[in-house]
Amino acid sequence: QNEFMSAIVAGKTLDSFIKPEYLFQILTCIEATIPFVRPSADGLSASDRLYQRLQETNSKFNLNLTEAELIETVNKSVRMANRDISGFAAPSEIFIENTWNLLPETNHALLALNSYTVYDYRVAIEKTERFLSSLNPEFIFRKFDGKPDEKTYRNLVERARHNLEVGTLYLGCKLFSIAFMEALSLRVGLNIPLSTMMGEANCHDF
């Protein structure tokens, strides 16, 4: 939804200022930031399918982009997409920190600092651990037309694989400890704030 809305806003905002073929390229880059797209049943990657759609759209709307321009557009979109998710290949401590900092963004109950419950906290960690466990490192980063080169691409994949393993283990340990804390909190009552059990936290202590 975020990428779709970004494309709509970009299209409406820039439509009067730039040529259709340039807007076409911008929207292509925005679409490429949709993450974790798996290959199709016939083995085509997300970038391969995007390239096919660009060819069809270019022909349908007479945008007159050359084959070389279409390929370069997809290559630009790949670079943008890979930068957008570069954190998956970051050093493990940075990956863990980034994952931790995103918890409130995807679990709005945690925005109510010092009032979210032990249950809220446990659910947030459980959802994130389940999400990381579901990711296939082979489908995180993109490539097209030999770019990035195979060595660079495999390095990104293996670093992502390592980070997913570390992140899943870390969150699994957190989940075990908070499940124990949740069991204790139920002896006190339902919907007990985490701060009641552990003390008040600052915004970086999720």
Positions of PLM-derived features:
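An active-site-proximal "capping" alpha-helix that borders the catalytic cofactor pocket
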Residues: 2-16
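Divalent metal-dependent phosphate-bond-processing catalytic cores, especially two-metal-ion Mg2+/Mn2+ enzymes
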Residues: 12-21, 31-206
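His-Asp-centered metal-binding catalytic motifs of divalent-metal-dependent phosphohydrolases/nucleases
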Residues: 1, 6, 27-36
